[in-house]
């Protein structure tokens, strides 16, 4: 068993005659938390090889060291398999950062971003451990030009500030095995919050609650492990950021930062104000809220430095909408208005758009005229059409996630569906999926509905489109960002031409198809139907939503 030698012969002070660490399989959930850990009182950090490090334990007792090393290997087999293996680059740097959250309520969103990044990182090590109002992040990095350019740093900016630990960057070739033990103990054994390790994008094993309890019982009682959270190279981030353990009645976790992080501060205000305006002015797309005069009159909202906060608030509002059914959206829009009252037939103040809407009465009349024309004046066909549309939009039927209309030009397809897109707001448009467009589906993530106008795709994407039309989760490439996960999102397809998925058997249960005819009478209408017309239409034909 190795008592502190480097995994590469780079240090002249290595100690001989030690065994190779054994590997262990077995997995536990990364979400399990360590409820009992070593005493977390902050003490003065010790010099290298001093008290509280695995190197010091190796000096004191080889038997104790071997036992502890074996236990650590069992608790983090993937972690140690990578850092002591041949695939890790000696020239890479070990980076340790701390995310100071601006608001504790942003913690889960920030953790989701870190998990998604960890899954998408196809090389190297990435891990994090959460401690309430801050999150520790570690990873190996090429450290080009002596700087880390990993994209997760910019992705977490809306949630807090990324701070360095204050220690000089250390390269992989400088690490001894005992150093890696100390890293694992500090970040993944002693931490109480959410923890995760990713090796080449695959989730690695972390200590379970039982393992942490056993570690505490076996080693804390014997005082084999110091209560210090720090070693020479991994100084406690809490000390670096001046966290005090003094009890504070005004702090939920009893910690005080010398440089106070925002608590319901600027970002919380911006998010609250932006979402309030988005409820007052129903704009499409959501980001168009920046053009509303009331938004532009607010100096804080208009500050270019707060652009990321505004985008994060808009994304958050979009997620609220994405989880809503048609009925919930209707309730949201009718809290302050009675849209069936003749005096409220034209509530323009709610809907802000680049196009001008007709009033609800005229809008309803023209939409009914269009549907009667396309359904041969058959009310049963109109009811069937609207019922199928609601089933797709509300994701009611498993594997049925696409609604298609094929017609000649000027049939009223966009005229009808612009009303729905204006209502749902959070919609994305799919592009032409060919070898020249690698990001055709980049607008698919975090949307309430998707529009695919005049679809065209290569056969290699057939399986992805099957998942899309069947409501299965899938991943898409996004320009200048990591790959994004897409949950079930309804797809509206409008086309003038026949495309392969319209007649392939594999898609028959995934798509509802209708054929429309050219509607020349629509050229006499200059205004678009008001979005709220859709709800009046459903009520007229007794469609449940």
Swiss-Prot record:
Cofactor: Mg(2+)
Family the entry assigns: Belongs to the parvoviruses initiator protein NS1 family.
Top EC group: hydrolase
InterPro entries: Helicase_SF3_DNA-vir (IPR014015), P-loop_NTPase (IPR027417), Parvovirus_NS1_helicase (IPR001257), PV_NS1-NUC (IPR049901)
Subcellular location: Host nucleus
GO CC, one annotated term: host cell nucleus
Function: Multifunctional protein which displays endonuclease and helicase activities required for initiating and directing viral DNA replication. Also plays a role in viral packaging and transactivation of several promoters. Binds site-specifically to 2-3 approximate tandem copies within the origins of replication (Ori), unwinds this hairpin region and nicks one DNA strand thereby initiating the rolling circle replication (RCR).
A molecular function (GO) term: metal ion binding
Pfam families registered for this protein in UniProt: Parvo_NS1
Domain writeup: In the N-terminus, the endonuclease region is involved in binding to the origin of replication. In the middle, there are the ATPase and helicase activities. The C-terminus probably contains a transactivation domain.
Residue intervals of the SF3 helicase domain: 346-545
Summary of subunit composition and partner proteins: Homooligomer.
Sequence ranges of Basic and acidic residues compositional bias: 1-12
Residues annotated as binding a divalent metal cation: 130, 134, 136
Catalytic activity: ATP + H2O = ADP + phosphate + H(+)
Domain of life of the native organism: Viruses
Chain spans, region Disordered: 1-52
Residues of the PV NS1-Nuc domain: 12-277
Statement: the UniProt record of this protein carries the keyword Transferase: no
Name the UniProt record assigns to this protein: Initiator protein NS1
Main location (coarse class): host cell
The species this protein was found in: Junonia coenia densovirus (isolate pBRJ/1990) (JcDNV)
Gene3D superfamilies on file: P-loop containing nucleotide triphosphate hydrolases
């Amino acid at each position: 068993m190795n008592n502190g030698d480097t995994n590469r012969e780079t240090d002249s002070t290595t100690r001989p005659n030690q065994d190779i660490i054994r590997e262990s399989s077995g997995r536990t959930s990364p979400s399990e938390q360590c409820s009992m850990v070593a005493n977390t009182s902050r003490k003065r950090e010790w010099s290298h090889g001093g008290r509280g490090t695995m190197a010091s334990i190796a000096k004191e007792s080889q038997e104790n060291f071997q036992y502890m090393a074996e236990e650590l290997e069992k608790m983090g087999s993937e972690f140690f398999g990578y850092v002591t293996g041949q695939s890790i680059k000696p020239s890479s740097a070990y980076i340790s950062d701390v995310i100071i959250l601006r608001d504790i309520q942003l913690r889960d969103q920030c953790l989701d971003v870190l998990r998604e990044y960890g899954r998408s990182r196809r090389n190297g090590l990435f891990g994090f451990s959460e401690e309430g109002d801050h999150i520790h992040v570690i990873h190996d990095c090429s450290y080009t030009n002596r700087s880390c350019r990993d994209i997760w740093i910019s992705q977490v900016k809306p949630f807090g500030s990324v701070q360095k630990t204050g220690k000089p960057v250390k390269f992989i070739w400088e690490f001894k095995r005992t150093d890696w033990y100390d890293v694992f103990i500090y970040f993944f054994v002693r931490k109480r919050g959410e923890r995760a390790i990713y090796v080449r994008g695959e989730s690695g094993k972390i200590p379970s609650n039982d393992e942490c309890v056993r570690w505490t019982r076996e080693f804390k009682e014997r005082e084999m492990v110091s209560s210090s959270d720090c070693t020479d190279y991994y100084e406690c981030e809490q000390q670096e950021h001046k966290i005090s353990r003094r009890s504070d009645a005004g702090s939920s976790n009893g910690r005080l930062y010398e440089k106070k992080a925002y608590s319901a501060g600027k970002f919380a205000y911006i998010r609250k104000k932006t979402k309030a305006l988005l409820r007052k002015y129903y704009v499409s797309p959501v980001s168009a809220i920046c053009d509303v005069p009331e938004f532009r009159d607010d100096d804080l909202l208009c500050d270019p430095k707060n652009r990321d906060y505004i985008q994060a608030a808009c994304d958050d509002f979009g997620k609220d909408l994405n989880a809503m059914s048609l009925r919930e959206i209707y309730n949201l829009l009718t809290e302050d208005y009675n849209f069936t009252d003749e005096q409220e037939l034209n509530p323009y103040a709610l809907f802000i758009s680049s196009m001008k809407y007709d009033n609800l009465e005229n809008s309803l009349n023209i939409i009914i005229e269009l549907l009667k024309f396309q359904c041969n004046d058959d009310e049963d066909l109109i009811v069937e059409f609207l019922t199928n549309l609601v089933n797709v939009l509300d994701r009611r039927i498993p594997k049925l996630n696409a609604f298609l209309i094929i017609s000649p030009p000027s049939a009223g397809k966009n005229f009808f569906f612009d009303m729905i897109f204006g209502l749902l707001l959070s919609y994305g448009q799919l592009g032409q999926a060919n070898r020249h467009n690698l990001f055709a589906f980049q607008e698919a993530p975090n949307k309430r509905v998707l529009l695919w106008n005049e679809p065209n795709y290569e056969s290699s994407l057939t399986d992805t489109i099957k998942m899309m039309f069947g409501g299965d989760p899938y991943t898409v490439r996004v320009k200048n960002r990591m790959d994004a996960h897409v949950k079930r999102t309804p797809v509206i397809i409008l086309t003038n031409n026949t495309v392969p998925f319209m007649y392939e058997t594999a898609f028959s249960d995934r798509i509802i198809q209708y054929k429309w005819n050219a509607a020349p009478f629509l050229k006499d209408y200059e205004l678009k139907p008001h979005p709220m017309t859709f709800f009046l239409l459903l009520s007229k034909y007794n469609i449940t939503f």
